[in-house]
Amino acid sequence: MTHEKLWGGRFSEPTDKFVEEFTASIDFDKRLYHQDIRGSIAHARMLGKQGIIPMEDVEKITAGLQEILRQIQGGQFKFSVALEDIHMNIEARLSEKIGEAGKRLHTGRSRNDQVALDIRLYLRDEIVEVSAYLDLLVDSLISQAEKNLGVIMPGYTHLQTAQPILFSHHMMAYVEMFSRDKGRMEDCLRRMNVLPLGAGALAGTTFPIDREHVAEILDFPEVTRNSLDSVSDRDFALEFMAASSILMMHLSRFSEELILWSTSEFKFVDLSDSFCTGSSIMPQKKNPDVPELVRGKTGRVYGNLMALLTVMKALPLAYNKDMQEDKEPLFDTIDTVKGSLKIFADMVGEMRINTGNMRAAAAKGFSTATDVADYLVRKGMPFRDAHEVVGKTVAYCLSNGKDLPDLTLGEWQGFSDKIGEDIFGCITLEASVNARSATGGTALERVKAEIARVKAGR
């Protein structure tokens, strides 16, 4: 393949070799080859339709690009750093193959709008994949919720025992979070799904192009409305990376819980051996490497977002070479999010729940204390007074090595004469859980209804 610069007419000296290597992006943007070829074929078809280039050339261009696609997919295409990027590598090879017709492909187009198109096409496909992986994770969560209906565990605030909840309720909390993550991805897709091709370098083109025709070929519902904006901004990539950062934050929180729950101190869950590793020195160890790595990779995704925000923060309109730095953080974010979601969906689907340990933990720490306060309120006591009474009751229990169910009726009535025999029915774990039956609560029937609602909407 010739390494002559396609933009070299103005220059009298060759590019310094290190400058070529420093400015080239082919090592990472070659993953855009399919989108670049698809966009070029659509552009050529439009040029032919508009009579800007002969239809005979369109046929040669299309056939040549399809052959290049097969060569790349078959590992037979040699990429050149001297040709800088995926666009120039493909165009140079095309011209080498088909001659003069290949040189007409770039009519009415700039690399500025070409790369904006390629990234949108690529990211559009990747968002669909990310959404599919989110669906798999939600399926795993729902499956665990259904298999473990009725399993009671402690709910926490400040990582201190707060109130008993259903394990299924906890799983469905993550279903809500990851469902919103999918919604953010869909919102991002809706805003980015516009065609930038036709914006030219920055001001449009003097040729009578038909942008709407290209949009139809490439399945874009509309075209961008300002040529400067079309090539200047990467907010669509930033929006995806911001949504990905929130998604990874949710995965990281879940990871932290699984790490804690799998310790010998909690023993709430057992992660499958296939998702854990051992120690090189301690033979007893079973380390939760997968959730630990996902937790760690969350910072990587945050860093990618900040990197691109920093690149874009002071750029004058329109295109600047700084924007070449958009791809590596974007691609890394895509790869990290997809990998994390896939492995998490599989891991959650295979984890085993230690129901006895969860229940035993829920029975400790005065988890039904709020139920006693609510009981007194229903007996006519103001809530703040009830709170005070129960606080003193808990202090008494701590001093005497007792828990709430251990108290006799006489001991209860020493704190309030409003307390009767019915107090004992209010402080069981099942009673506490099922009393919270308002929409969004942890009551068994409410959780069942939420599972059914989510499944019906999928």
UniProtKB/Swiss-Prot annotation:
Belongs to the lyase 1 family. Argininosuccinate lyase subfamily. This is Argininosuccinate lyase. One of its GO terms (molecular function) is argininosuccinate lyase activity. HAMAP family: Arg_succ_lyase (MF_00006). GO terms for biological process: arginine biosynthetic process via ornithine; L-arginine biosynthetic process. InterPro entries: Arg_succ_lyase_C, Argininosuccinate_lyase, Fumarase/histidase_N, Fumarate_lyase_CS, Fumarate_lyase_fam, Fumarate_lyase_N, L-Aspartase-like. It comes from the Bacteria. Pfam families: ASL_C2, Lyase_1. It comes from Geobacter metallireducens (strain ATCC 53774 / DSM 7210 / GS-15). GO terms for cellular component: cytosol. Keywords: Amino-acid biosynthesis, Arginine biosynthesis, Cytoplasm, Lyase. It catalyses: 2-(N(omega)-L-arginino)succinate = fumarate + L-arginine. PROSITE patterns: FUMARATE_LYASES (PS00163). SUPFAM superfamilies: L-aspartase-like. Pathway: Amino-acid biosynthesis; L-arginine biosynthesis; L-arginine from L-ornithine and carbamoyl phosphate: step 3/3.
